[in-house]
Amino acid sequence: MKGYFTVALFYFTNSVFQTFKSLIFEKKSLKNNYWSLLLLLLCFNIWGQENYTISGTITSAASNETLIGVNVIIPELNKGAVTNEYGFYSLTLPEGNYTLQVSFIGFENIAQPLQLSENKKLNFSLNESTETLDEVIIQENVEQLSIRKPQMSVNALTAETIKQIPVVLGEADVIKSILLLPGVTNAGEGASGFNVRGGAVDQNLILLDEAIIFNSSHLFGFFSVFNPDAIKDLKLYKGGIPARYGGRVSSVLDIYQKEGNSKEFHANGGIGAVASRLLVEGPIVKNKSAFLVGGRASYAHLFLPLFDIDNKAYFYDLNAKLNYNFDDKNSLYLSGYFGRDLFGVSDSFLNTYGNATINLRWNHVFSDKLFSNLSLIYSDYYYGLLLDFVGFQYDSGIRNFNVKYDFQHYLNSEIKLSYGVNNIYYRFNPATIIPNRPDSGINPSQLTHKFANEFSVYAEAEHDISEALALRYGLRLSHFTRLGQDAFNRYQNDQALNYNDQLELYQPATPVEVQTNTGTLATFTNLEPRASLSYLINDNSSFKASYNRMAQYLHLISNTNAPTPLDVYAPSGPYLKPQLLDQYALGYFKKIRNNEYSIETEIFYKDIQNRLDYRNGAQLIANDAIEGEVLSGKGRAYGLEFLAKKNKGKFTGWLAYTLSRSEQQTPGRTPIETGINNGTWYPSAYDKTHDISAYVNFELNKKWNFNANFVFQTGQPTNFPVSQSQFQGLTIANYATRNQQRLPSYNRLDLSATLTPKNKNKTIKGEWVFSIYNVYNRMNAASITFRTNEDTGANEALRTSIFGILPSVTYNFKF
């Protein structure tokens, strides 16, 4: 062993010498020596006194389900660890006698003596409980641990909190819940998706059990695709994003499903005004294997014929999961999701869209310090449109096949390494047009399929430098290949858009050549450094800072915020460059009165390169030359976020405020070209200057629980015509610069009450949820259109609103 140590020390010393030599004497850049410096920082902490490791898995005693985010703490050393996404933890400590504390919100805490003179495997099963005095004491240590972690701009919501927040039609909803967090908005009622810190919908990486979800909305954006009964853990990363995530430039919404109860059978569900849900779970092999199956469906369309309405709008989805624990070191998981939305008008129009995923994962514990997860993932998004009155079916979509292998290496109590590799293969179908009847008059058409591959590798260290200073630093290397296709357009001077200086507008260029059976069309390689730090001011407050660069190689081609937009994903290539983000954030975090209250304040700045913009009059539907409709610009967003929370007591909740700007700029490519808005900065479609949200939960007693939330937002940017002209008897509206007007401000108050009666039948437990959405019946504008009054000939504005006041009742049950 001594010989190995001598050799290692020699190579380490030589590496240090060569690194400083290249930096100081040869004046090479820091970028070229990034990995050497990272190694240098790590190695200072690897050698020391004799240490031993405790490791294991923490589960729920009731279901054997692993628990994410459990705190394992040694208060004497102010050291601790947190269980990962599969309930595994590892903590390396000097030899000695300690107190070991295990704490997780909603569960009984464990405090026991620990005599550490050898490596130990310690598994724990936690019992559900209400808060006790011991829990408060241990929780103080937990909060001191969390406030010094080098992680910022992240929000977590439990399934219980999501179910308490009153939303439209009484259905608990993930997306509607995160809209109450600072920095998160959407385009308004009836709009799909969500926007984070001024970013677009397609700039969010949405993961369900590691599989990509391309559209997060059901039923015009009124519901999300996530069944709240099936959710185990949810985190939203808005900045300081860990190196293991990539492919999007705005945020990461990472959701894990429950695994299923391997001890006994259970079922729970709910019956609401427009939808119902049911989830069943139980053991396959007791204490070793479990299953979970959950489904939801809406049925409001069944009542429309009673009102002589010949339309339909409904959704359904299915969640399923199997797991098998072979032994303490090997576990296998198979999970999937399938969802569809259907919207039809009479028999002439039918719109169908939805996601599907399947994921096979293998967990393996190599040692008490090394954990791994191998995932094989398939996901797709389908969009279909049946226009019977025209006589054709339109289909489009995107599929991907993903292989990823992730490792978590717990070197010692100061350093945790994460590293891994990921490869995603994409297949794009822009459009397939098929006539659906003999007299259609529509010719069959297939737009060119596109193919791409995205490879990435990353490494990251979480490093406790001292009692006060903690760092997380890492690097992600991504490589994107635009693969060959059957036909590809080539343009003169590689410009797919021409500028007409007489008309002062952009027009699609005519291809000078169409290549067939092409080889690789383009490759892009990007280094994506990530860094964040936390400095502990005292036991209850800290200062944090972060920087991250991210690359996005997929583009959502859509110039509408409509609830069922005709969205098409396109890969980067010779004419569509990848988006690149640089984000900086600073924050101050404070806990008050043993974490009864907490305050989080952050400022951020985002700079985005190669942000797509559309020429005036862009034609995006069934266009095989989409590159002739878009321009490359840039974007920026900056702002302040404030979050004040009350975490304990009969009254709990939070107040969130965001002051921000989100802007785009698309200058001309030459001095002659005007670009968009004459090349000046203008508000993006996601710019909301002021965003205020408040949530309050009041637990009156064991029977009654009351909730309220309030939202106020600056109106969404929009375009109003400034004049009109006549052409061949038609009135044509004329517009000036983009997004210089706004819709009226948006505000809404929602209330709910939950009644949990005493259940005489202990087998079945139930609760009633009474909710009122939009209590004061404000008709918030979803859009404003203009028309000519037939009687007076004057122009008039027409406001379109989605919802007024909506009361609802839901019955939830479990057994």
Where are these regions (language model features)?
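C-terminal beta-signal and adjacent terminal beta-strands/loops
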Residues: A551, K703, V711-G729, Y746-D750, ...
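Transmembrane beta-barrel wall of Gram-negative outer-membrane proteins
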Residues: T53, G272-Y299, D308-L342, L350-L374, ...
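Short strand-turn segments of transmembrane beta-barrel domains in outer membranes
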Residues: G221-S224, K232-P242, S251-G282, A290-Y314, ...
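Gram-negative outer-membrane beta-barrel transporters
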Residues: F604-D607, I626-V722
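Periplasmic N-terminal accessory/gating domains of Gram-negative outer-membrane beta-barrel systems
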Residues: E108, K120, I137-P242, V252, ...
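Surface-exposed extracellular loop regions of Gram-negative outer-membrane beta-barrel proteins
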Residues: Y382, R427-D439, N443, T481, ...
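Periplasm-facing N-terminal accessory domains of Gram-negative outer-membrane beta-barrel systems
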Residues: I46-Q139, A468
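Outer membrane beta-barrel strand-and-loop segments of large Gram-negative receptors
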Residues: N400-N402, Q446, E454, P571-K577, ...
